Amino acid sequence: MRKLFLIMNALIFSGCLGMPKSVKPVSDFELDRYLGKWYEIARLDHSFERGLSQVTAEYSLRSDGGVLVLNRGFSDADNKWKEAEGKAYFVNKNSEGYLKVSFFGPFYGSYVVFGLDHENYQYAFVSGPNLDYLWLLARTPTVETEIIQKFIEMSEARGFDTENLIFVQQK
Protein backbone atom coordinates (compact mmCIF):
# COMPACT_ATOMS: atom_id res chain seq x y z
CA MET A 1 0.00 0.00 0.00
CA ARG A 2 2.88 2.36 0.77
CA LYS A 3 4.26 1.78 -2.73
CA LEU A 4 0.91 2.70 -4.25
CA PHE A 5 0.88 5.89 -2.16
CA LEU A 6 4.37 6.81 -3.46
CA ILE A 7 3.59 5.90 -7.06
CA MET A 8 0.43 8.01 -7.04
CA ASN A 9 2.40 10.97 -5.70
CA ALA A 10 4.93 10.49 -8.50
CA LEU A 11 2.35 10.19 -11.25
CA ILE A 12 0.39 13.20 -10.12
CA PHE A 13 3.38 15.45 -9.59
CA SER A 14 5.71 14.21 -12.36
CA GLY A 15 6.96 17.13 -14.38
CA CYS A 16 4.67 19.62 -12.63
CA LEU A 17 6.91 22.49 -11.60
CA GLY A 18 4.60 25.28 -12.62
CA MET A 19 2.04 27.04 -10.50
CA PRO A 20 -1.36 28.58 -11.14
CA LYS A 21 -1.02 31.98 -12.83
CA SER A 22 -3.07 33.49 -10.01
CA VAL A 23 -0.68 32.24 -7.30
CA LYS A 24 2.47 34.08 -6.25
CA PRO A 25 4.92 32.57 -3.74
CA VAL A 26 5.59 34.53 -0.58
CA SER A 27 8.84 36.45 -0.38
CA ASP A 28 10.99 36.76 2.74
CA PHE A 29 10.52 33.02 3.30
CA GLU A 30 12.68 31.65 6.13
CA LEU A 31 13.19 27.91 5.83
CA ASP A 32 14.61 27.56 9.36
CA ARG A 33 11.34 28.90 10.75
CA TYR A 34 9.25 26.70 8.43
CA LEU A 35 10.93 23.46 9.47
CA GLY A 36 9.18 21.22 11.98
CA LYS A 37 5.74 19.68 12.29
CA TRP A 38 2.64 21.01 10.54
CA TYR A 39 -0.94 19.76 10.83
CA GLU A 40 -3.13 19.60 7.75
CA ILE A 41 -6.26 21.61 8.56
CA ALA A 42 -7.91 21.60 5.12
CA ARG A 43 -7.20 20.35 1.60
CA LEU A 44 -8.73 19.72 -1.76
CA ASP A 45 -9.33 16.03 -2.40
CA HIS A 46 -6.78 14.00 -4.32
CA SER A 47 -6.07 10.30 -4.56
CA PHE A 48 -2.88 10.13 -2.52
CA GLU A 49 -4.54 11.50 0.64
CA ARG A 50 -8.07 10.24 0.10
CA GLY A 51 -9.58 8.83 3.28
CA LEU A 52 -6.74 9.98 5.53
CA SER A 53 -7.24 11.78 8.83
CA GLN A 54 -4.75 13.12 11.38
CA VAL A 55 -2.52 14.20 8.49
CA THR A 56 0.78 15.87 9.34
CA ALA A 57 3.85 16.99 7.45
CA GLU A 58 7.27 17.22 9.06
CA TYR A 59 10.10 19.13 7.46
CA SER A 60 13.77 18.87 8.44
CA LEU A 61 17.09 19.68 6.81
CA ARG A 62 18.85 17.13 4.64
CA SER A 63 22.63 16.85 4.56
CA ASP A 64 22.63 18.07 0.93
CA GLY A 65 20.90 21.33 1.88
CA GLY A 66 17.46 20.20 0.79
CA VAL A 67 14.45 19.47 2.94
CA LEU A 68 13.39 16.03 4.18
CA VAL A 69 9.60 15.72 3.94
CA LEU A 70 7.66 13.17 5.98
CA ASN A 71 3.92 13.09 5.34
CA ARG A 72 1.79 10.93 7.59
CA GLY A 73 -1.92 10.19 7.86
CA PHE A 74 -4.26 7.62 9.37
CA SER A 75 -6.44 5.47 7.12
CA ASP A 76 -9.66 4.57 8.91
CA ALA A 77 -10.52 2.09 6.15
CA ASP A 78 -7.26 0.18 6.67
CA ASN A 79 -6.97 1.03 10.37
CA LYS A 80 -3.31 1.94 9.99
CA TRP A 81 -0.90 4.82 9.46
CA LYS A 82 0.39 5.65 5.99
CA GLU A 83 3.63 7.52 5.42
CA ALA A 84 5.44 8.99 2.47
CA GLU A 85 9.00 10.30 2.67
CA GLY A 86 10.24 12.80 0.14
CA LYS A 87 12.69 15.57 -0.52
CA ALA A 88 12.28 19.20 -1.49
CA TYR A 89 14.50 21.91 -2.93
CA PHE A 90 14.04 25.58 -3.70
CA VAL A 91 13.16 26.27 -7.34
CA ASN A 92 14.51 29.82 -7.45
CA LYS A 93 15.95 31.63 -4.46
CA ASN A 94 15.78 30.30 -0.89
CA SER A 95 13.93 33.39 0.31
CA GLU A 96 10.93 32.55 -1.88
CA GLY A 97 8.24 30.06 -0.84
CA TYR A 98 8.55 28.08 -4.06
CA LEU A 99 9.94 24.56 -3.79
CA LYS A 100 9.91 21.37 -5.82
CA VAL A 101 9.09 18.17 -3.95
CA SER A 102 9.61 14.54 -4.89
CA PHE A 103 8.30 11.37 -3.29
CA PHE A 104 9.53 9.05 -6.03
CA GLY A 105 12.78 9.16 -7.97
CA PRO A 106 13.38 12.05 -10.34
CA PHE A 107 9.75 13.20 -10.44
CA TYR A 108 9.07 16.60 -8.86
CA GLY A 109 5.98 18.67 -8.26
CA SER A 110 5.47 22.25 -7.15
CA TYR A 111 5.04 23.27 -3.52
CA VAL A 112 4.08 26.94 -3.43
CA VAL A 113 3.56 28.79 -0.15
CA PHE A 114 1.29 31.69 -1.15
CA GLY A 115 0.08 32.70 2.30
CA LEU A 116 2.07 32.65 5.51
CA ASP A 117 2.01 33.94 9.06
CA HIS A 118 5.30 35.81 8.57
CA GLU A 119 5.39 36.92 12.21
CA ASN A 120 5.11 33.55 13.95
CA TYR A 121 5.01 30.87 11.21
CA GLN A 122 1.84 29.40 12.72
CA TYR A 123 -0.07 28.80 9.46
CA ALA A 124 0.65 28.43 5.75
CA PHE A 125 -1.48 28.37 2.60
CA VAL A 126 0.04 26.01 0.03
CA SER A 127 -0.67 25.28 -3.63
CA GLY A 128 0.57 22.60 -5.96
CA PRO A 129 1.16 22.91 -9.72
CA ASN A 130 -2.45 23.81 -10.54
CA LEU A 131 -5.76 24.78 -8.96
CA ASP A 132 -6.51 21.16 -8.01
CA TYR A 133 -3.99 21.17 -5.15
CA LEU A 134 -4.54 23.30 -2.06
CA TRP A 135 -3.69 22.95 1.62
CA LEU A 136 -4.05 24.89 4.85
CA LEU A 137 -1.29 23.87 7.26
CA ALA A 138 -0.89 24.95 10.87
CA ARG A 139 1.41 24.32 13.80
CA THR A 140 -1.55 23.21 15.91
CA PRO A 141 -4.31 20.65 15.17
CA THR A 142 -6.94 23.42 15.10
CA VAL A 143 -6.95 27.08 14.08
CA GLU A 144 -9.13 30.09 14.71
CA THR A 145 -12.11 30.70 12.44
CA GLU A 146 -10.47 33.92 11.22
CA ILE A 147 -7.54 31.98 9.75
CA ILE A 148 -9.87 29.55 7.97
CA GLN A 149 -11.87 32.48 6.59
CA LYS A 150 -8.69 34.22 5.40
CA PHE A 151 -7.56 30.98 3.74
CA ILE A 152 -10.90 30.56 1.97
CA GLU A 153 -11.00 34.19 0.81
CA MET A 154 -7.41 34.18 -0.48
CA SER A 155 -7.93 30.82 -2.17
CA GLU A 156 -11.21 31.81 -3.83
CA ALA A 157 -9.60 35.03 -5.09
CA ARG A 158 -6.98 32.87 -6.83
CA GLY A 159 -9.54 30.59 -8.44
CA PHE A 160 -9.49 27.55 -6.14
CA ASP A 161 -12.75 25.64 -5.67
CA THR A 162 -13.14 26.09 -1.93
CA GLU A 163 -16.62 24.54 -1.96
CA ASN A 164 -14.88 21.17 -2.14
CA LEU A 165 -12.45 21.67 0.73
CA ILE A 166 -12.02 18.76 3.10
CA PHE A 167 -11.49 19.75 6.72
CA VAL A 168 -9.17 17.15 8.15
CA GLN A 169 -10.07 15.39 11.38
CA GLN A 170 -7.22 15.84 13.86
CA LYS A 171 -7.18 14.20 17.29
Language-model features: locations:
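A beta-rich soluble binding module of mature secreted/lumenal proteins
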Residues: C16-K171
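Sec-dependent N-terminal signal peptides
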Residues: L4-F13
